[in-house]
Amino acid sequence: MFVLPGYDAFLGFLLIAAAVPVLALVTNKLLAPRSQDGERQLTYESGMEPIGGAWIQFNIRYYMFALVFVIFDVETVFLYPWAVAFHRLGLLAFIEALIFIAILVVALAYAWRKGALEWS
């Protein structure tokens, strides 16, 4: 018997969510071919002979653009439910959303002024 009776379904979903990836990994380990010859360990380059190593360093600029994208992607995730329920939330929720957007605009302006978005 579970202590919090209202959370039985949540516990069930949590157990299923933990079991599915483990089951997928175990199934893969059991059914995957075991061949480890030298050619299977090479990097795949669309059927061509691999040239050089697969480990290269990426420019840090890609990281900065990805970070800015993630920030504004998360902003969209937070603002979408607000936009759906906008008509029921009232003026206070509108002001809170404006403050949230203003903080992110200030962060974008700061990154822009510091040159984080420059590609030179």
From Swiss-Prot:
GO cellular component: NADH dehydrogenase complex; plasma membrane-derived thylakoid membrane
Keywords: Membrane, NAD, NADP, Plastoquinone, Quinone, Thylakoid, Translocase, Transmembrane, Transmembrane helix, Transport
Tagged with keyword Transmembrane helix: yes
GO molecular function list: NADH dehydrogenase (ubiquinone) activity; quinone binding
Reactions catalysed according to its record: a plastoquinone + NADH + (n+1) H(+)(in) = a plastoquinol + NAD(+) + n H(+)(out); a plastoquinone + NADPH + (n+1) H(+)(in) = a plastoquinol + NADP(+) + n H(+)(out)
GO biological-process terms attached to the record: photosynthesis, light reaction
EC annotation from Swiss-Prot or TrEMBL: 7.1.1.-
Membrane disposition: Multi-pass membrane protein
Predominant location: membrane
Similarity annotation: Belongs to the complex I subunit 3 family.
Its biological purpose: NDH-1 shuttles electrons from an unknown electron donor, via FMN and iron-sulfur (Fe-S) centers, to quinones in the respiratory and/or the photosynthetic chain. The immediate electron acceptor for the enzyme in this species is believed to be plastoquinone. Couples the redox reaction to proton translocation, and thus conserves the redox energy in a proton gradient. Cyanobacterial NDH-1 also plays a role in inorganic carbon-concentration.
Protein name as catalogued: NAD(P)H-quinone oxidoreductase subunit 3
Species of provenance: Synechococcus sp. (strain WH7803)
Lineage of source species: Bacteria, Bacillati, Cyanobacteriota, Cyanophyceae, Synechococcales
